[in-house]
Amino acid sequence: NPTRTALETCLAGLEGGDFGLCFASGMAAIDTVLRLFSPGDHILAGNDVYGGTFRLFEVVLRPLGLDFTFVDSTDLASGAAGLRSNTRLIWLETPSNPLLGVVDLPGVAQLSSSNAVTGKRPLVAVDNTFATPYLQRPLELGADIVVHSATKYLGGHSDVVGGAVVVNDPDLHARLAFLQNAAGAVPGPQDCFLVLRGVKTLPVRMDRHA
C-alpha cells in the first residue's frame, strides 16, 4: 500500500536507517523480529522490559524452543555474564517501560562485537518507543534493529495502534520483509495516515515531555 510505504520511508528517515517496515501493533513488530531465530537460539534481554514483551518471550516463544535470559541491562558486566555461545540477539529497551532504565548502547554494541564467548556476533535490537528518534537514534549508537510501538509517542493522539521496525542491513530487511508479508500483521492505510499525521507534531510533543 502506498500510504504504508510512505510511513515506512518516513520512519526509516527519522531513525537514520535505510529500511522501514510497519506493522499492525508494536507487539506484531516485536514478534516478527523474534521470528528471525530458531529453536535452541538464546536471546539476552533486559529484566525490566515491557510486560507484553516479557509475556511474548516467556509464555509464547520459550515453549517453542527459544531460550531467554533476563539481566540488568543498565549493567554491562551483568550483560557480559549473560552471553552464551548460542546468543543470537540482545534485546533492549532504553528508556525501559515503565521503569525508565537507561542502557549504554555503545557499550552493549561493543560487548556484542567483541564477545569472546561466541564466534557469531549477536544482533542488537532496541525498543525505542519511549525515546523516539527525536531524542535517540539507536542505529547510530551501534544497534542493528530498532523497534517502535507507534501507538504511543509516534502516533501521539491515542487514536491509532501500530508498530515499526527499522534496519540498515539489506539482507536483514529482506528477511523481515518476507516475514511481514508472510504473517500479514500490517497496518491499514488509515492507520498509516494517522501515524504520519502524528509524526508532524513529534518535536513539539517530545520537547514538552522532556
Positions of PLM-derived features:
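A glycine-/small-polar-enriched, mobile loop at the entrance of the PLP active site in fold-type I
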Residues: 1-13
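Conserved PLP-enzyme active-site core in the AAT-like
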Residues: 19-210
